[in-house]
From Swiss-Prot:
Protein encoded by which gene: argG
Family the UniProt entry places it in: Belongs to the argininosuccinate synthase family. Type 1 subfamily.
Species whose genome carries this gene: Sulfurovum sp. (strain NBC37-1)
Record HAMAP family: Arg_succ_synth_type1 (MF_00005)
Main location: cytoplasm
Pfam families: Arginosuc_syn_C, Arginosuc_synth
EC number from the UniProt entry: 6.3.4.5
Protein name: Argininosuccinate synthase
Reaction(s) catalysed by this chain's protein: L-citrulline + L-aspartate + ATP = 2-(N(omega)-L-arginino)succinate + AMP + diphosphate + H(+)
Length: 447
């Protein structure tokens, strides 16, 4: 199929080997003008060098965009996701997945601003990111052209990439010393894939982990912190109010120090294969624990249970790149409605990889000490439980009377076996069972 004629393309550009080669390839293959977009999501690397690299490759200064998106990333993407307590397949806190919608959004905005008719990314044809990026592009601009070089070119090995870079005079720092892993980082996490991790039985080397100390080498003394919440979002640490990005940066500092947030998982990619990934999400791990703790005293029981039922669906939508979908927006509206009274303070103990909740309080707490006390109280009539239990057991009682053979299959024949002769008061256990289901005469009203 003939290539669509492209006049200008916005490239998600990091300044690294892959995207620098893509930049040159777009110029040669599509003969189009290229606009570079570099996002600062708190990945911990200098982003300004990408400007000079783009200039060196002939990009006009007005076509180079480097944006600090840290606050927007945490406020508008990370925090809403954490209101849902989203976890994919029980462990993954979606650090890569949640960054892609924002990058897609900014690329489309820049395309409209510069009059570009295409966008391009550096995701491979085997991973999830190609789907996440492109679903975002097409949700926000159905007419935009999408260029995915990894699905078009034949540069399918690092050797070929380096040869292409050398042939075209692309200056890549340390191009002869590739990183040992495929990595992605932002304020929420850092990920590692590839190399010896492709053997799912091989233990990661300790020097792979770049953010956190190992739990074994973490401080021998625990550290206590408090996190304050308002409308489901953290607003202060140790009573000091901070911006969203600063909140996450601060929690990352605590988590890294105490070896918190490391996971090693094999996940089911949306493209059909299983892939192993190692992740460090120190601040996010602390934040998730604290959020669930404050919800435990401020959410109604059924509200909390329904949220837990919705969470896997929500997490799957994020993982699969469906951030801009109607169903994600619908779920987000429902989740956000539950957060109106999720406010208060959580006290945490951080110790050798563990986040331990040791206290929680709220002015709108649904926890009532006078109702839940084990001591004498004047507000809870324990006799009220009898009717509640009888009503909940009504279907069991009817079933026991109408279908006695089924009950017998569950507890055996009603003979005074060795077990049944165990006495509780003046009657045996079997007699109690028979009376409960209406098979025996009840002579003791307290039985």
């Amino acid at each position: 199929m003939a290539k669509r004629k492209i006049s200008k393309a916005v490239l998600a550009y990091s300044g690294g080997l892959d995207t620098s080669i893509i930049l040159k390839w777009l110029q040669d293959e599509y003969e189009c003008e290229v606009v570079t977009f570099t996002a600062d999501l708190g990945q911990g690397e200098e982003v300004e060098p990408a400007r000079q690299k783009a200039l060196d490759m002939g990009i006009k200064p007005e076509n180079i965009f480097i944006l600090d998106l840290r606050e927007e990333f945490v406020r508008d993407f990370v925090f809403p996701m954490f209101r849902a307590n989203a976890i994919y397949e029980g462990e993954y806190l979606l650090g890569t997945s949640i960054a892609r919608p924002l990058i897609s959004k900014k690329q489309i905005e820049i395309a409209h601003q510069t009059g570009a008719d295409a966008v391009s990314h550096g995701a491979t044809g085997k991973g999830n990111d190609q789907v996440r990026f492109e679903l975002g592009y097409l949700a926000l601009d159905p007419d935009i052209a999408v260029i995915a070089p990894w699905r078009e070119w034949d540069l399918n090995s690092r050797t070929k990439l380096l040869a292409y870079a050398q042939e075209h005079g692309i200056n890549i720092d340390n191009k002869g010393k590739p990183k040992p892993y495929s990595m992605d980082a932002n304020l929420l996490h850092i990920s590692y894939e590839g190399e010896h991790l492709e053997n799912p039985y091989a233990e990661p080397e300790e020097d792979m982990w770049l953010w956190s100390v190992s739990p074994e080498n973490a401080p021998d003394e625990p550290e206590y912190i408090t996190i304050s919440y308002k409308n489901g979002d953290p607003i202060a640490i140790n009573r000091e109010e901070m911006s969203p990005a600063t909140i996450l940066e601060t929690l990352n500092t605590y988590g890294k120090k105490h070896g918190i947030g490391r996971i090693d998982i094999v996940e089911n990619r949306m493209v059909g294969m299983k892939a192993r990934g190692c992740y460090e999400t120190p601040g996010g791990t602390i934040m998730l624990k604290a959020h669930r703790a404050i919800e435990s005293i401020t959410l109604d029981r059924e509200e909390a249970h329904m949220k837990d039922e919705l969470m896997p669906k929500y997490a799957k939508l994020i993982y699969n790149g469906m951030w801009w979908s109607p169903e994600r927006k619908m779920l987000q509206a429902a989740i956000d409605a539950t957060q109106e009274n999720v406010e208060g303070t959580v006290k945490l103990k951080l110790y050798k990889g563990n986040v331990i909740v040791v206290g929680r309080k709220s002015e709108v707490s649904l926890y009532s000490e006078e109702h839940s006390t084990f001591e004498a109280d004047d507000v809870y009539n324990q006799k009220d439980a009898e009717g509640f239990i009888r009503l909940n057991a009504l279907r069991f009682i009817i079933e026991g009377k109408k279908q006695p053979e089924r009950i017998k299959s569950l507890i055996g024949d009603y003979e005074e076996t060795e077990v049944c002769r165990i006495e509780t008061g003046s009657i045996t256990i079997c007699e109690r069972i028979k009376r409960f289901f209406g098979f025996g005469k009840k002579t003791d009203k307290n039985a």
